[in-house]
Amino acid sequence: MLFRSGTYYSELRKTHGHEVPYGVHVWCVGNEVDGPWNIGQKRAEEYGWDAAEAAKAMRRIDPKIELVAVGSSGTQLDTYLEWDRVVLERVYDSCDYISLHRYMGMPAIDELSTYDRRDTGDYLELASRLERNIQDVIAACDYVKGRKHSDKTMYISLDEYNAVDIGPEADDFLKECDPWEVGPCTRRTGISMRTTLLFGLGMLAILRHTDRIRIACQSILINGDGMVMCSPDEDAWVNGSWHIFRLCSLYGRGKVLETVQESDRYDTATCKDVAALDSVCIYHEDTKELDIFAVNKTEEDMEFTVQAAGFQQLQALEHLTVTAEHLSDRNSAKEKNKITTVSTQDITCGAEQIQCILKPYSWNVLRVKERIE
């Protein structure tokens, strides 16, 4: 696809009306080849060798491309992390990223025996498993970096992530259809506010590790557990995750500040001493804006105070809240805004301090700005 003409695929591209190559810059050297669900599954040693040789050939065609090696497909696999170590030993000098996939709440990955899906606190803690997954892969990368005495840093391509709403609240999993039907129906129940919160907590975990996560792709975009839902006989509508993703895209660009947080703690069905609050702060040097992402994981209002050291004069801009009346609420073609974003002006700013109230089970963005006199 990188040639203008003269190869089978470049000529095929031209027959479809595209004279110029698509200019794809990032290439994945395989996908989930460690997974037993795949035909052509490989051992780490086999894949590492093949990937390194493929990378060599691809860079001879275009030295400027970036390459993603296949990382372990899930923490549930016996080869988890050992796969990453072995592959990285082989491809460390020839690839730029290692992939990571995570679907929070998918039974095959987050084993039902290790958490209680009916317990909201337990369910929301699945975001901490994503964060641990990220930390594990970073550790594997840095271990190989040390082994090789390398100055190169391996980055992560989180090229599949989402929160999956499968369980008692989403019994209408798949509509019955002909197994050979082209474009069959997929689940269109949408995701609940509870799963929206889980997705939002996962986004904060990603933001905290953007020093190593250079690529992140939400999966899937349309239907299933996607951000956008549609049907041949109904209007399109958005899931709660769309609101989260939109606000992260708008206000999650900048410098992630190191934060220390204190909050009440609680126990869940299987977890002890869980923080009731999660938060991330982003500073935008160009606009002097400080955006605080905060999640109240409890059923009560939360008094939220930020000690913003070094920010002497602050001006409140907006408090954005993704919320719903009930955790089980979900958007649909008939009720498109049961989960929505609400804007209020309830932030109080003082010298190095920001205060507001976080609603129960809510995902928030507090937007403030340095006042320049």
For each of these PLM feature ranges, what is it?
Residues 20-39, 71, 84-130, 154-155, ...:
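Aromatic- and acid-rich polysaccharide-binding/catalytic face
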Residues 271-276, 295-373:
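C-terminal beta-sandwich/jelly-roll accessory domains of carbohydrate-active enzymes
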Residues 151-279, 287:
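Aromatic/acidic polysaccharide-binding cleft in carbohydrate-active enzymes
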Residues 46-60, 82-86, 132-139, 198-205, ...:
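Alpha-helical scaffolding segments of alpha/beta enzyme cores, especially the outer helices
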Residues 27, 98, 137, 160, ...:
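Conserved, mostly hydrophobic/aromatic
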Residues 6-8, 35-37, 45, 72-82, ...:
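Acidic-and-aromatic substrate-binding clefts and catalytic sites of carbohydrate-active enzymes
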Residues 11-17, 57-79, 130-163, 214-221:
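Aromatic-lined carbohydrate-recognition surfaces of secreted/lumenal glycan-active proteins
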